[in-house]
A protein has these predicted regions:
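Double-stranded RNA-binding/processing signature
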Residues: 1-171
């Protein structure tokens, strides 16, 4: 993996990883893990991949989005729920992944097949990887919700800027 592209990604995330293996795991799709394990003659799960991180990242994302919405002065449970659900949708996460250039910079390690298959699954690959990266940041920061929240605020910057405009100028 290109160290320059990893550095660019860390800059975009606002988090320099102390343990780069956590980031590499977050960027490793199960298809790559399984192929690499089979090459080494190992069991499929011996090569760490993003699946567990995706689950953890999803939970952390939900909690931090709520905190960020409260910080934006969203006052009601209903509004927080609606806005959080919009921000955590796969399409929104895929937009974030596209801004991070996860596929474009070949940062997602995968063995999915040809380019057509990659493009067909691009939304899922990007959104899952964004969630996995959030988990990797959380673990790398010593389970710091504050550090993870700071990074989520940065990578969701355009979405929160748009939200603030809507809150200031409701239609």
């Amino acid at each position: 993996m290109d160290p320059v592209k990893i550095q660019e990604l860390e800059d975009q995330l606002g988090h320099p990883f102390n343990d780069k293996r956590l980031l590499i795991r977050a960027l490793t799709h199960p298809t790559f893990s399984n192929v690499e394990s089979m090459k080494k003659g190992e069991a499929k799960r011996d090569c760490p991949h993003q699946e567990t991180y995706t689950t953890l990242g999803d939970a952390i994302l939900k909690a931090d989005l709520i905190l960020l919405l409260v910080d934006c002065d969203v006052k009601t449970k209903g509004n927080i729920t609606i806005l959080k659900e919009d921000l955590e949708k796969n399409l929104k996460l895929a937009d974030v992944g596209e801004r991070l250039k996860l596929l474009e910079n070949n940062l997602i390690l995968h063995k999915i097949g040809n380019e057509t298959k990659v493009q067909e699954g691009a939304v899922t690959y990007r959104s899952d990887t964004v969630e996995a990266i959030i988990a990797a940041i959380f673990i790398d920061s010593g389970d710091s919700m504050a550090e993870t929240k700071k990074c989520i605020k940065k990578i969701f910057g355009p979405e929160f800027d748009e939200l603030k405009k809507k809150l200031l100028n409701p239609q």
